[in-house]
Amino acid sequence: MEPSVEVAAVPTIEEEQPAPAPTIEIEETADIPDTPLAIEALRSRDYPASELIIEQTLDPGANYQRYIAYYSSDGFRIYGLLTVPDEAMPANGYPSILFLHGYIPPDTYVTTADYVATQDGLARNGFLTFKPDMRGHGRSEGEATGAHFSETYVVDSLNAFSALEI
């Protein structure tokens, strides 16, 4: 006869279920203003490529040419300082910089004087640069609209970018 062995009951382990993820409700606390500077508004516009027209040849730089050029933005001529390297243009075009600077009051702004040293440094290193005057500055047509939240300056900048792409 075999000895009997009493087997204790094996406790079962109940698997813990993860707690359900909390539901997060987001309430809008502020309305996005309907403004022409909103990304959605800017994306809804067209920025037609305008040809960049050279109007005046200036004295050359060390290894580049300098010009006063303009493009069209919302029916206005926007002038600026254009530098073009003397070297032959690469197959995919010159590396280009659209030089957008901070606000300078229109009554003191001079196309060929402001930021010239910076633009010269870029041009000496083989970059095509274009520094638009912005609306109402220098010889650019239209009205200067101030330093902050200017829809026209944003539009003029995007149109300048399109002009450089062609």
Task: Walk through the language-model features, giving the residues of each.
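Loop/turn elements at helix/coil->beta-strand transitions in domains of secreted/extracellular proteins
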Residues: R77, G93-P95, N125-T129
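Short amphipathic alpha-helix adjacent to the substrate-entry channel of hydrolases
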Residues: T111-K131
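Ser/Thr-rich, Proline-interspersed low-complexity disordered segments
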Residues: M1-T35
